[in-house]
Amino acid sequence: MSLFPQILLRLLFLAFTLKSTSNAEKHDKVDYKDFVRRDDGDTCLRYTTIYSQGEYETTITIPPNSYSNGVSLSNGTLLSTSSPLISTSGQFTSNNVSTTSSQRHNTKTITFFSGTSDYTSVYYDTTGTDDVVYEYHPSSERHKSTNDTWSTNLPTNPTTTAIYSTSGSSNITTPYSNRITNSNTSVNDITSKYLSVGTITLTTISGSDLYTSTFPANGTTSGTVEVVIPTAGTVTETAVSGSELYTSTFPANGTTSGTVEVVIPTAGTRTVTKISGSKFFTTTTDASGTVSGTVEVVLPTAGTNTMTVVSGSRFFTSVVSASGTVSGEQVIVYPTAGMVTETIVSGSEIFNTTYPASGTRTGTVEVVIPTAGTVTETEISGSELYTSTFPANGTTSGTVEVVIPTAGTRTVTKISGSKFFTTTTDASGTVSGTVEVVLPTAGTNTMTVVSGSRFFTSVVSASGTVSGEHIIVEPTAGVVTETVVSGSVGYTTTYPAHDTVSGTVEVVEPTAGVVTETVVSGSVGYTTAYPAHDTVSGTVEVVEPTAGVVTETVVSGSVGYTTTYPAHDTVSGTVEVVEPTAGVVTETVVSGSVGYTTTYPAHDTVSGTVEVVEPTAGVVTETVVSGSVGYTTTYPAHDTVSGTVEVVEPTAGVVTETVVSGSVGYTTTYPAHDTVSGTVEVVEPTAGVVTETVVSGSVGYTTTYPAHDTVSGTVEVVEPTAGVVTETVVSGSVGYTTTYPAHDTVSGTVEVVEPTAGVVTETVVSGSVGYTTTYPVQGTVSGTVMIVEPTAGYVTVTTSLGSSSYATTVATASGTSTGTVLQVVPSLFPGCNSKCTSSNAFRILVENDSISPSYLTYRESDGFGIASSNPSPAGSEGIFYYDSTLKRVVTCCDERPYYRTMEGDLAKTYFFIEDEGDGTYKFKLTYGAFSEYLDVKILADSTFFFKAMDSSSSTILNQKVRASNVYFKAVPL
């Protein structure tokens, strides 16, 4: 059942509340009793009484070793006996017994006297049978004082207590479960189900308002769960996943095992829920001075790690020394400290706001992979063999830092009828999370390449060299990506944080040193050696595709991520190679069906230039495939300009590489140093545009919108234009289409814009009702176009009622200046109506009626108010609302509904709602002057039903009753 009908049903049933006619009156309190161990070691017998308006507890403290009958409590165990009741007649002085009573919330107070007193504990019957009063037998709950000698009789059964009914003798299960499980259970293991130590939970129902608060007691700290995995020692782990093999060895000497620390529940949280009429208010705030729970994980622990990975023809081996190294660390804060979440439901509107508390920060995740040490890597790709060794001395391990969720995000969701609106904004002054990785650091590189008959060996000295550096920001530094899925609706927003800079990729391969080359072709062998003295080493600097650009592809399971983005203030990439003499080097390698042709310029040479650069600088493209869900996002980095395409062919300063592996071919062209890229007249897509496509089952989402501060391309046709987000959702028979612009964007100046920037178009089809809404986003300006379809700033709603369709167009957007077309749908309400509106009115469906479908319907033909039948004509069902003054459901003309129960809708036999005059109502079945009350039950899902009486109750059952076990349900218009 959706939220809107539930709210209306609550209103309906508040008006139809029944007062039971049972013989016994309910009492307004419930008593509980259990044993607890106090911090000072005393064993306490605690009595807790909960009233309908609050609660309080009274504790009798029984010190250890106080019993004279030889049964001791000093070991923390309970008395052992097989009898139904423990009769502890042991004597101990009143000086050893203390009685305390504390009032919790506007309640009565129990006092245990030192004289003679009898106590009776009253319980509610929870078995669902007749309402009967139960009480303890006097001998099971009596405390007397004679000459300072106390006698205590306590029940021992862990789940039941010998209690007796006023109407007979029977054992009844008490409505609480926190009993001692057996006679040998330590009281240290007992935790009261009610009023847990250090935590106060208060629930109050006053009228239609429900208040729930949970907060820690003064000076207490929430509970913790601590796990250590694995324990200290030597651990050898081998994992095979697909073609990947992982082996890790951790020495025990001096190492520390990983820890897992959980705090549940989070300390210092207060939650208040209020229900007032149809409004629900929920607020969660942190208590003053408290800190939220933390989860800490250390994986793996410090030590020596050996990892071998086989992926296709590639082998990776890494050895990390434990000496002086620090293990990777992962720190998670869940939930985020200092966060306030507020949910308000007012009528059909839902408001959700999440924002950080004053002075708090969001949680962080930190990972160090791999840790500092020695890394040896061997890679075989086809006929190529690569081996690299990196010493640990002076190296620094990589770091990964993530902040989830992004600090300071506010999300508001509004539901109006079948329409969903979601807005997400960032809080002022917050910064999004970053991911930073450093891969293999400075060291000595040895590379041997075998391609056909050619062997290449390069040795690079580590002395004075600079390590290759790989820095990744995922998502791009300062970029916030948020995805919200509500039902079948998915919302994704990507926007950059203020003044952030994107990441870079830089690789340095074989630097200054000695190069030895041996070529064997047939019986001819060639050997060339290049001395390092006074030579300038060949450098290869690759930014793929262009300099200052980061392209990252990650495949995890069925999930693939591809990201391309530029570094701050960088120029397109360069490839520079010196081999073996200055000038131009041309190299051709044929291996099997693979042909490689490379032309390298010598030092200080300048390559040719061309007119196309592909892909363009400053663009981030991300593709994620998870199951049947595909996500594609393209957006520019901060302060970048839209794209150019540059292609380099065999002219000077150009490197062209072609690799064929199986049926897969790869071709890459790199420009040389100091070249300038060409420009073109068309940019597709235009700069600053994000396009996202998501397919999940039968649900399809398409969204296009620009990044912050970007300007759309000026093109002949833009579909859709820059700054526009288009979303299409199909779920069953429901279709949603929404078009809206990103924050502060301006639409392109084009010949046709469909739809124009700054416009949101939403179409919802539910059953026979279709809704179409078009409206602008606040602060946006529509495009300058020849055709705008539909017109900006208008809401169009189409409603089908039976065979009739109505369309309404209303200008609702603030500040819009487009033409006005106003068509008013004929009113759903009768002419006498003065109370019903589209937001508060509903129909009442009768389920389980032998006439189906059945509604409470006005029947003017027989002049008898409201009767139940198939509506004729279609759409003639009665419309109702809740009158808060009358405190009941009435028609729009203030008529009080009837419901006929007999076959054929006999005018003389009907049911109606009778006002008892004390704020309660009864369902009454009438046949002429004869009347009976129906048996009415309210169900857990907030619907209710009533059933026909048996034949002994009424003569009216001589006719066929059709109202047996029927349900009423409110249905929104």
UniProtKB/Swiss-Prot annotation:
Signal sequence bounds: 1-24
Subcellular locations according to the entry: Cell surface
Glycosylation, residue list: 75, 96, 147, 171, 184, 218, 253, 352, 393, 848
Coiled-coil intervals, chain numbering: none
Annotated organism of origin: Schizosaccharomyces pombe (strain 972 / ATCC 24843)
Protein name, entry field: Putative cell agglutination protein pfl3
Swiss-Prot/TrEMBL keywords: Glycoprotein, Repeat, Signal
Gene label: pfl3
Domain DIPSY: 820-973
Job of this protein: May be involved in agglutination during conjugation or other aspects of colony formation. Induces flocculation when overexpressed.
GO terms under biological process: flocculation
InterPro entries: DIPSY, S_pombe_Mam3/Map4
Region 18 X 35 AA approximate tandem repeats, residue ranges: 198-828
GO CC aspect terms: external side of cell wall
Sequence repeats: 198-232, 233-267, 268-302, 303-337, 338-372, 373-407, 408-442, 443-477, 478-512, 513-547, 548-582, 583-617, 618-652, 653-687, 688-722, 723-757, 758-792, 793-828
Main localization, broad class: other
Family: Belongs to the mam3/map4 family.
